[in-house]
């Protein structure tokens, strides 16, 4: 089992050495201008840039959500006296119960279309 562990360790070290050697040679294959630019970028700290972007995106999202909520609230208040909304708000179960209690007052009307008496319904 120790030989397997040694083999694994040896392979890992070999792959790591090849990869690091390749990356170092690839990185050295740059011009002086690219190296100067890379040194300047490495010297700068981008943590504050990321923080700034997060704050700006957060403020923008807060403003958008506030506008959305205020618009929805104003539309809800604007249409509160609309007959459609009053229709929904009313308690229809109570109306049905009151109609059932007064069955003696109910009336039925039958309407007949005399012009359509010659037509038959096809199966």
From Swiss-Prot:
Main location: membrane
Keywords: Cell membrane, Glycoprotein, Ion channel, Ion transport, Membrane, Potassium, Potassium channel, Potassium transport, Transmembrane, Transmembrane helix, Transport, Voltage-gated channel
Gene Ontology CC annotations of this record: apical plasma membrane; cell surface; membrane; plasma membrane; voltage-gated potassium channel complex
Family matches, as Pfam families: ISK_Channel
Residue stretches spanning the membrane: 49-69
Domain of life per record: Eukaryota
InterPro entries named among the record's database cross-references: K_chnl_KCNE, K_chnl_volt-dep_bsu_KCNE2
Cytoplasmic topological intervals: 70-123
Membrane topology of the entry: Single-pass type I membrane protein; Single-pass membrane protein
Protein localization: Cell membrane; Apical cell membrane
Protein name: Potassium voltage-gated channel subfamily E member 2
Organism of origin: Rattus norvegicus (Rat)
Gene from which the chain derives: Kcne2
